[in-house]
Structure formats: C-alpha cells, structure tokens
Amino acid sequence: MHMNIDHARVRRESLRWIIILALNNARPVGAYEGVILSIAQSEYPDATPLELRRELDYLAGRELVKLDKEPGGRWHAALTRTGTDVAEYTVDCEPGIARPAKYW
C-alpha cells in the first residue's frame, strides 16, 4: 500500500505544536517572534519569519495564542488559557496541530 504524505501539512501542523510548546515554556511572559523562530529553526532550519507569522495568525484565530503586533513591526505572542490547556493535555486538541498522543 502506498501512502501519500502531505509534507507541507505535516510541517505546518508541527510548527504549530512547536510554537505552543515554546510559548508554554515562556509563560507567563510570552515571547517575541524572533525567539520563537529560532526555536522553530532547531527543527526546521529553513523556517522563515513569514511562515512563523502565518502559523501564529492561525493559532490566534483559534484563540490559542494572543498576539500583540507592535507598531514597530515586531510581534509578541503568549498562550491563552485554552492554549495552555492544549499544551498541558487537559483538553482535546482539534485537527490542525501535530500534538503527539498522550502516552502517560
């Protein structure tokens, strides 16, 4: 049996999980996009600022992340209460985020 893997989708969903984990570790202060990007680039060295912003916007749209788009151009992100619950496995995670299955 041949499986077609959508690599772009896997990458997007994995980046979203990486962002959530990074912001969970940055609580309660949150983090600027540059810090989050450097963390994302440890898994995806070719990750771009635009790609990161697209996924931050997605997570903000799902009300998992609060974004502060500063007038100077920098973005600051922090987890919402729901985002923290997703990171801590206390709520179900809807499709679109590559959260690993809970094993404990």
Across the structure, where does each feature detected by a protein language model lie?
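Short alpha-helical segments that sit at the start of domains
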Residues: 1-30
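Alpha-helix C-capping/helix-to-loop hinge sites
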Residues: 22-26, 42-43, 66
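Short acidic, hydrophobic short linear motifs in intrinsically disordered regions
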Residues: 29-40
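Short amphipathic alpha-helical interaction segments
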Residues: 46-61
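A short, conserved structural fragment
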Residues: 60-70
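Accessory beta->alpha helical hairpin/"wing" motif in late/C-terminal subdomains of nucleic-acid enzymes
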Residues: 70-86
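Short, amphipathic alpha-helical interaction segments positioned at domain boundaries
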Residues: 81-104
